[in-house]
Regions:
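Cleavable N-terminal export/targeting peptides
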Residues: 1-32
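Outer-membrane beta-barrel pore domains
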Residues: 4, 32, 36, 61-62, ...
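A short hydrophobic/aromatic micro-motif that marks alpha-helical segments and, especially, helix-coil
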Residues: 23, 98, 186, 361-362
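Outer membrane beta-barrel
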Residues: 30-186, 200-218, 224-229, 294-308, ...
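Glycine-rich loops and low-complexity Gly/Arg-rich segments
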Residues: 69, 112-114, 142-146, 189-192, ...
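A short secondary-structure junction signal
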Residues: 177-179, 187-195, 220-221, 248-250
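Interfacial loop-to-helix transition and helix-capping segments at the boundaries
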Residues: 195-201, 254
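Short, structured loop/turn "capping" segments at alpha-beta junctions
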Residues: 218-221, 273-275
Length: 378
């Protein structure tokens, strides 16, 4: 059988787009090999690299740090067996010092247009920020683990092993996802020193999300944090998860549960561009096992993207606020403010960001930081 090789604007266009209805805005540039009708393999690559300067971040504790970092490097592979069976395999260069890992390895089986079964390793249902991740968020950086703690405290960067029912109803306006997962990885990279092995009863983690789009529908399971002026969005989402004995220390085990509510508004043609507002509320409960990871969190952000290009791309200034209130008496509350600007060259495939941040941990002095990041996806 002859294989036809051609370059496409999306590494997921044939193999993954059909399965998950991920909008073209979030797709990668890449290459697709077609084997026949509805049979293909696609390959892509993404990376985020940055320069940062952090107050008192140098080894002497009093000077500013000056560091270049490769924050993320991913290989994207997706495939299509037929019009109803698709799959993906995505990797990350490193997770919490544990080296190269598979973050997504799953198959998607479309039962009917309104229902697709996901099985394997993938993002379990959660808030918009975690479903979008650092590559598809307003300015990136949700992995700071302040408000949206799923990406930071969610196993394989927010992923888990399990199965979920995913789909859209009401002409795509109502999105739903509900699944069962292995769990017990909620604090995999949290840096807790007193985590212990599970010795009590075993139980799965159950997670779900509902989202309603009042204006333009948002197709797809893996989401987008900002549509960069491409859509009119008014959306509200709720998510929750729970697992018996999902929090285990060296001396105690308890139920892990959390829920969140998130909101996104984007409007095109507001003056010379498009405006966006986002907000979210989180409640985390570890059954008093890890009080430092138990509490309430808040986030809010706003952005404005200019329609007229300047040189290669468009400017998008933005602001963001995050706060986590811990229940621990000895732990600290955290607040972070970001002010920045994105230079959008080709959607989420090519952009540069410059961000000034101020972080306040209760009981300590404020720490400011300046970060310039480059994101490229092929």
């Amino acid at each position: 059988m002859m294989m036809k090789f051609k370059m496409k604007k999306s590494v997921l266009a044939t193999a993954l787009l059909a399965a998950t209805s991920i909008p073209a805005l979030t797709a990668h540039a890449g290459a697709t090999i077609n084997f026949g009708e509805d049979k293909s393999i696609s390959l892509g690559f993404g990376m985020r690299s940055s320069f940062s300067s952090v107050e008192d971040g140098a080894p002497n504790g009093t000077s500013r740090s000056q560091d270049f970092s490769l924050n993320s490097a991913r290989i994207y592979i997706s495939g299509s067996l037929n019009k109803n069976i698709k799959g993906m395999l995505n990797t990350e260069k490193d997770i919490a010092g544990e080296g190269f890992q598979v973050i997504d390895g799953n198959v998607q089986i479309q039962i009917i247009p309104e229902l697709t079964i996901w099985a394997g390793r993938f993002l379990s249902p959660s808030d918009r920020a975690n479903m979008a991740g650092p590559y598809y968020s307003l300015g990136g950086g949700y992995w700071s683990g302040i408000a949206s703690r799923y990406g930071f405290n969610g196993g394989y960067i927010g992923r888990d092993d399990g199965v979920a029912a995913v789909g859209e109803l009401l002409d795509g306006k109502l999105g739903y996802s509900l699944g069962a997962f292995e769990g017990n990885t909620a604090f995999k990279i949290a840096g807790l020193t007193n985590q212990g092995p599970l010795t009590g009863s075993d139980g799965l983690m159950y997670a779900g999300r509902l989202q309603y789009d009042f204006w333009d529908a948002e197709p797809g399971y893996y989401g987008t944090g900002n549509y960069l002026g491409a859509k009119d969005i008014l959306a509200v989402g709720i998510a929750g998860r729970t697992q018996n004995n999902g929090a285990a220390s060296l001396t105690k085990e308890g139920r892990y549960s959390s829920y969140s509510v998130d909101f996104l508004l984007e409007k095109k043609d507001v003056g010379p561009g498009a405006v966006s507002f986002e907000a979210a509320y989180y409640d985390y409960d570890t059954d008093d096992v890890f009080l430092s990871e138990q509490g309430k969190a808040y986030s809010a952000g706003a952005g404005y993207i200019f329609s007229e290009p300047v040189g290669w791309g468009k400017f998008q200034p933005f602001v963001r606020y995050q706060k986590f209130n811990s229940d621990a008496l000895t732990a600290s509350d955290i607040k972070k403010y970001d002010v920045g600007v994105n230079y959008i060259i080709e959607g989420y495939n090519a952009q540069v960001s410059a961000i000034y941040s101020d972080t306040k941990v209760s009981g300590t002095d404020n720490k400011n930081a300046f970060n310039v990041a480059l994101q490229i996806q092929f």
